[in-house]
Amino acid sequence: LHVGIAAPYVALNPMFSLKETLAFHKQFCPFPLDFKLAEWLDKAGLCAHDDKRLSTFSSGMLQRVRLLLAVANDRPLLLLDEPLSNLDAEGVQFYSELIRSFALSKTIIVGSNYQKDEYSYCTNELLLEKHY
């Protein structure tokens, strides 16, 4: 099964630059033919950082990289755990546009703590509650 996943705890190699990370990922999970990488890096606010090591990125920048890698591929299943973690308002806007552009034809499972923006595009909702 081919799955795209994004979560705050998904590790990225901190010694790689953004450019190296994207090239490495692309070897295993090619981007769709209509995917314009430079355009999406700009929308993510990452264009000026493509030669910088990920170890210099903020938590919000790293989350945008994780989302980009998970969503912008041809995987039929997408798992997103707390996708808005560490994102500012611009990051939330980027997430929404990325989902609308690439993910709506996929099966998406979102783990969320009730942030409607994280799953507003979902057609079904399952509420899991812990009872003591």
Locate each region found by the language model.
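Conserved catalytic loops of ABC-family nucleotide-binding domains
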Residues: L98-Y119
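ABC-family nucleotide-binding domains
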Residues: D81, L87-D88
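Hydrophobic anchor residue at the start of the ABC signature
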Residues: L67
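Conserved ABC ATPase "signature" region
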Residues: A23, D34-H49
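ABC nucleotide-binding domain signature
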Residues: L1-V10
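Q-loop/switch helix immediately C-terminal to the Walker
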Residues: Y9, P14-P30
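Conserved ABC ATPase signature
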Residues: R53-G60
